[in-house]
Amino acid sequence: MSTFEKINKVSVVIPVYNEEESLPQLLERTIKSCKQLEQEYELILVDDGSSDNSAKMLEEAANIEDNHVIAIILNRNYGQHSAIMAGFNQADGDLVITLDADLQNPPEEIPRLVATAEEGYDVVGTRRRNRQDSWFRKTASKMINAMITKATGRSMGDYGCMLRAYRRHIIDAMLQCHERSTFIPILANTFARRTIEIEVAHAEREYGDSKYSFLKLINLMYDLLTCLTTAPLRLLSVVGSVIAVAGFLLAVLLIVLRLIFGAIWAADGVFTLFAILFMFIGAQFVAMGLLGEYIGRIYNDVRARPRYFIQKVVGVKKPNKNQEED
């Protein structure tokens, strides 16, 4: 077993986006849970450009003395994982725990994650027990998990559950990565030597709706596909070769059939020509779209713009970094 530094402080990072209804209960339950820890703790809540009163409520919570709350206000919405990275940049705990603000994963699980990490793990993942989501979200999640496992070779049952714990050296390694599109559980596993996944409770969403719509889930799948591997580019070569061979064989078959049955059978070749043409055009558009995804990500990385811009930090205990360092 690897030798780990003792956990003296725990940081809990929570991205917040339009969660004003759940925030009072979230703060109360998370603070109560953290008070059970033997270690020092801090709560870092990152407002990801909310349009409701979430940012104001976070600032008020951070201004309460001895509340151990730090509020980070981003100037606009950058997405869940960018908001979490902003929280990582502020956190100074030996163990950093991420938690969603919707209370579907109970904050009461935090002490168990800390205890598990103390057993000598770099990353403590979680798997939702009796998941309270729609059939569509469960199915999409299974597809994404299978795709991630295939691409990374790391088998974990629930990459979509953000209730996770990361050792300090994993956080430091992730902060050195500056790609624009980041999926934190996968990024962490690329640096982790020892990982474990434990079951945690999962509740129905009590307030509001999920922030991941159908279109956002589709975008997430594209992000994961193009961030994880270049296998789709290699697949294009295989598909192109198969289409070329199939086209050649079909052409030979049509010539033979025309010689046997005559021009009337082939309808002068018009419909056959259209069928082959549409097949090739469809394959080309798919290939162009996929190549465009990769080129677009290269373009975004080359521009080297920050993942996020911090408008304000309230309750800060370390020097304010107004934006991520590149």
Swiss-Prot record:
Pathway annotation: Glycolipid biosynthesis; 4-amino-4-deoxy-alpha-L-arabinose undecaprenyl phosphate biosynthesis; 4-amino-4-deoxy-alpha-L-arabinose undecaprenyl phosphate from UDP-4-deoxy-4-formamido-beta-L-arabinose and undecaprenyl phosphate: step 1/2; Bacterial outer membrane biogenesis; lipopolysaccharide biosynthesis
Keyword Nucleotide-binding on entry: no
Chief place of localization: membrane
Catalytic activity: UDP-4-deoxy-4-formamido-beta-L-arabinose + di-trans,octa-cis-undecaprenyl phosphate = 4-deoxy-4-formamido-alpha-L-arabinopyranosyl di-trans,octa-cis-undecaprenyl phosphate + UDP
GO cellular component terms listed in the entry, alphabetical order: plasma membrane
Key words of the record: Antibiotic resistance, Cell inner membrane, Cell membrane, Glycosyltransferase, Lipid A biosynthesis, Lipid biosynthesis, Lipid metabolism, Lipopolysaccharide biosynthesis, Membrane, Transferase, Transmembrane, Transmembrane helix
Membrane topology: Multi-pass membrane protein
Any GO MF annotation of the entry: phosphotransferase activity, for other substituted phosphate groups
Transmembrane segments: 236-256, 270-290
InterPro entries: ArnC_tfrase, Glyco_trans_2-like, Glycosyltransferase_2, Nucleotide-diphossugar_trans
Source superkingdom: Bacteria
GO biological process terms, semicolon-separated: 4-amino-4-deoxy-alpha-L-arabinopyranosyl undecaprenyl phosphate biosynthetic process; lipid A biosynthetic process; lipopolysaccharide biosynthetic process; response to antibiotic
EC number(s) on file: 2.4.2.53
Subcellular location as annotated: Cell inner membrane
PANTHER family per the UniProt record, alphabetical: UNDECAPRENYL-PHOSPHATE 4-DEOXY-4-FORMAMIDO-L-ARABINOSE TRANSFERASE (PTHR48090:SF3), UNDECAPRENYL-PHOSPHATE 4-DEOXY-4-FORMAMIDO-L-ARABINOSE TRANSFERASE-RELATED (PTHR48090)
Stated role: Catalyzes the transfer of 4-deoxy-4-formamido-L-arabinose from UDP to undecaprenyl phosphate. The modified arabinose is attached to lipid A and is required for resistance to polymyxin and cationic antimicrobial peptides.
Sequence similarity: Belongs to the glycosyltransferase 2 family.
Protein name: Undecaprenyl-phosphate 4-deoxy-4-formamido-L-arabinose transferase
Phylogenetic placement of the source organism: Bacteria, Pseudomonadati, Pseudomonadota, Gammaproteobacteria, Enterobacterales
